[in-house]
Amino acid sequence: MKRSMKFIAAFLLLPCVATAQVTDSIQQYGRGISFDMKESTVAGAMATSEQISHKTSIDPSNSLYGLIPGLQVLQNGGYAWDDGATLYIRGVGTSNSSTPLILVDGFEREISSLTVQEIESVTVLKDAASLALYGIRGANGVVYIKTKRGAVHAPVINFGYEFNFSTPNRLPDFVDGYTYAQALNEGMKNDGLSPRYSQRELDAFRDQTYPEFYPNVDWWDEALRDHAYGNNVNFSISGGGERVQYYAQLNYLNNLGIYQPTEENDGYSTQLKYSKMNIRTNLDIKVSNTTKVKLNLLGVFSENNRPQSDISTVFGALYQVPSGAFPIKTSQNIWGGTTVYSNNPIANIAGSGYLRTQGRTLYADMSINQDLSSLLPGLSATVNVGYDSYGFYQEGNVRTFADQSAVKGWDGAEDTYTKLREESDYTFDTSLKTMNSHFNFSAQTNYDRSWGEHKLNATLLYSMDKKIGQGQNNKYAFMDVVAQGHYTYKNRYILDFALSGSASSVLEPGNRWGIFPSIGAGWILSEEDWLKSDNLNLLKLRASYGIAGRADFDANLYKYYFGSGNSYYFKDTPTSQSGMKEYRIAVDGLTYEKSHKLNVGVDLMAWNKLSLTVDGYYDHRTDILVDGSGAISSVFGMTVPMRNDGIINSYGVDVAANWTDHIGDFTYQIGGQFSFARNEIIEMNEEYRPYDYLKRTGHSVGQIFGYEVEGIYQSQEEIDQRDVKQYLSDVRPGDLKFKDQNGDKRIDQYDQVALGYNETCPEIYYGFNVGAEYKGLGFTAYFQGAANYSKILDTKSVYRPLVSNNTISQYYWDNRWSESNPNGTLPRLTTQGSDNNYNTNSSWVADASFLKLRTLEVYYQLPEKWLKNIAFVKGIKIFGRGHDLFCVDGIDIADPESIGVAHPTMRQYAFGFNLKF
């Protein structure tokens, strides 16, 4: 089923478009700056703790699917400690990294270190009015996470427990041993070679008369169980008095993966195991009437366990080894193998030893705020200090497992067993994998004053960031000086302005600083006398323009590097001499990317039920670091350095809406969000291309190029009679037939055109949600989808069978072209590969649009009257949840977000309860 999800998106979003963002009263800019959202000119959007709490995922990024307009969240692998999503803000705006800046309580930190339960809100900053504050690090946007804090009230204790289990999504289906043998013979015949297996060997596969020599092993069934499971326990307490408020949390979670067998070793397991404990304390201390201190501490302790063979090795073997290659073990109790296949999947799991990684992370920060109103009314000063330290240690036993081939002796000959590899002794090893630290210091003065119909808030800030990583050339520093002002007149006319000077250590001395201005304006029409109405809660127009930067390059690109050179011969009698040579040419005039951002938006709230936000934007990105080979002659003689010549334009729209209402005891809510983000390469130093349709310039970043397929050659006669000749490789019946784009009667590299869309980030991204509750019984459902999104189907064995000794999927076997199946839609089988088939072409470029049910929660909150007789208990909630329950798409046999050789994504179920005391 191939159709674009954009039509589904448009249909579903007519009545409801995204979660309301303007209903929350305070918007966080970061930098110690926050304003009432009613009086903000910023294109910011926010998800609250209540919204993200419906999925207590191991990595909080997986709780953000489809929640925040302008934030694209794409799913990655499915195993516990690498389950984080990829985040983009307003799509891709550069040919380099588009990763946004992640801030936790104002400090750059990893979202994966947090738990869902400790997050108060997640705010996405998207336009220049907010991003100019971050100067040289703001161009890709900012995700600002605020953690929970205490308040003045009696202690409130929350305890929650969740049991979860998950099942793999869309595992590939590979053929049995008999079918594989048939496929291999067919492929070799198509290549003009003799068949690999005789008829009696085929019969042995089919009848399983000699399973040791002609096996039929379902490697996926033997290596993986059908579920993973885990626990999540959370305890928190908050409260405080006038002097001290506190929030403290203890969270523990674990997860056991899908490998089997994993317990047959002496004293250790090779299961995919993960556990993590978070301990957080947030304190607000009123030292005096004019002095306040905030102290935040977070300790994260994690451990993961796996076989010595890493996940890519295990799944690489599962995707490659045929069912009929060898038995799991021979009759001599030695792991099976052959000279071709030395990667027994089960031996990789159970026989290679184990590797355990332990992580220790400390996040500590403190801020001191001093009220200076005695000097000047409205004046205050704040100092912030943060220090992070994290290290990862590894230990493990490693060994080489023995394997053995088994060959059947026919016609009275003896069976042959050949030892391919001897088993080694265990070697125990420990090592420090990573040790990093991060120091941040900032000092700022704030002025907040109202007089008459005027309000002014101004900030002057200095900030310094320093990161020290393990190894050479792994130190980075940033420095910022920021001036910001926010002015409001008559509660309806708003002006924001900012000017920041920002520097990065990765740039050349003397060229490290940049200036980043911005201006924003807003008009609250609903405050005008001629528009005031009880039904119109808010109507605001706003616009902003400014510049933000990006300079997260590798260190020392501005330096020349020299290394040892090859020998050179001197004099009449050649004498070899070694020496030094230029290894890397410096980037001349290395500078930061400059993102010129324009945003226009409108916010609407009506009837105390409806909220709507619409933003349109344009981003002109210049000085992008790109390959310089298109601008410098190839006679240069060595690798051409990169240059800041790239230009990319991006534009789009973000829409968010929500409707909340009640009828008696029945409350309901419906909402969603829709984002469209497109980019266009204006300049990339592209090499000369003889035809316009070959040019990458003018297309989006990551646009797929390849051959356009017109069909499949059915016979040698058709090949001979066609006046267009394919010069990619020898053409045989069953090969793909490509379109001649330039009319020169030949198919070569000049016949590639743009196919589909990019495979990095979808242009259309949307989500919608619906929820209802009646007397404590309720449900919430979150859907998320994407469109204008393509993927290249090139997974080995699934779409690239037999070549390089791969197995073959049932899908390919059923749909291949053959003499007996001329209507097959996939190319002929081959063991040698073919540039006519296994290249990038329209047959392998799939529409990756999808719609997923990300979360479905059903819950019951016990009535308060039931709890009156239970001492100290103020609330009980019981729930059941499902995540990624179904996906509507056109690929069917694979998750459109996870194409390739990897751990499968997982469908998750959870049951639990929350207690409030």
Set out the residue ranges of the language-model regions.
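Outer-membrane beta-barrel proteins
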Residues: 107-150, 170-174, 214-234, 253-294, ...
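Extracytoplasmic gating/loop element in the C-terminal half of outer-membrane beta-barrel translocons
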Residues: 196, 321, 325-330, 347, ...
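Conserved small-residue
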Residues: 158-211, 309-310, 662-760
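C-terminal extracellular loops and terminal segments
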Residues: 639-649, 688-706, 755-771, 798-814, ...
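Short, small/polar-rich motifs associated with maturation and membrane association
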Residues: 1-279, 293, 689-690, 742
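Short aromatic-centered micro-motifs
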Residues: 102, 487, 741, 772
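Extracellular/periplasmic, surface-exposed regions of secreted and cell-surface proteins
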Residues: 282-291, 297-301, 306-311, 316-319, ...
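Glycine-rich, aromatic-lined ligand/substrate-binding cores of catalytic
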Residues: 759-792
